[in-house]
């Protein structure tokens, strides 16, 4: 029988992450807005604590190849992002790309999922979400190549309309291509039921559909 690997609890801080102070009303007024790629133990703990305390889906675990970022400013920690493996099958995404089943299996690693995106609930700063999205999309392909030896060409993300309208994705020039089928990532037998979500895509390379179908 296959041995089950025990899951360990995520590393956390001993107290909540401090709230940012004196944050301006618009992202353009933040002088030192940075994305920090999570690497050190301290950064892992901050990211986990933020997600566990403030993101509706918690810290994970994320699936497959992954890169995580913290959003830092001179005012404090503003949130975080996590990129991980894409959905195995996604009808509207696969149709937009033009995939058949064999090509999808061969090229699926070139698509990554923005599986966590948190602007802290206490942060109210105009255009911050779309600005941070843009910053992450400019560095994530390089960071994936540095860590895993290949470049992703497309990012997908899911938006639950009961919680969000997708405005920040639209402002950052993502493309809405349809809806998910309301099943989990590994639900091959149609047994799970989760809310259907809007699917947004963002190309990280030119001619992305042709590349993914080659």
List PLM regions with ranges.
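Hydrophobic or amphipathic alpha-helical targeting/insertion segments
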Residues: 1-9, 163-165
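Conserved N-terminal entry element of GNAT/NAT acetyltransferase domains
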Residues: 6-40
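Short, charged, solvent-exposed linker or helix-capping segments at domain edges/interfaces
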Residues: 210-214
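Acyl-donor binding region in acyl/amide transferases
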Residues: 33-68, 72-208
């Amino acid at each position: 029988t296959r041995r089950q690997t025990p899951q360990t609890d995520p590393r956390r801080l001993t107290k909540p992450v401090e709230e940012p102070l004196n944050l301006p009303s618009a992202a353009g007024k933040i002088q030192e807005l940075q994305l920090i790629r999570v690497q050190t133990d301290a950064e892992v703990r901050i990211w986990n604590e933020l997600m566990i305390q403030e993101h509706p889906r918690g810290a994970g675990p994320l699936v497959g190849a992954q890169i995580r970022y913290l959003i830092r400013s001179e005012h404090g920690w503003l949130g975080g992002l996590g990129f991980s493996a894409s959905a195995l099958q996604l009808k509207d995404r696969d149709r937009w790309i033009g995939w058949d089943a064999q090509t999808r299996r061969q090229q699926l690693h070139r698509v990554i999922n923005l599986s966590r995106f948190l602007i802290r609930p206490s942060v109210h700063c105009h255009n911050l979400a779309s600005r941070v999205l843009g910053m992450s999309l400019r560095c994530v392909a390089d960071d994936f190549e540095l860590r895993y030896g290949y470049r992703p060409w497309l990012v997908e993300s899911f938006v639950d309309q009961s919680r969000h309208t997708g405005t920040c994705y639209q402002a950052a020039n993502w493309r809405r291509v349809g809806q998910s089928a309301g099943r989990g990532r590994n639900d091959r037998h149609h047994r799970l039921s989760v809310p259907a979500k809007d699917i947004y895509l963002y190309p990280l390379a030119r001619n992305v559909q042709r590349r993914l179908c080659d």
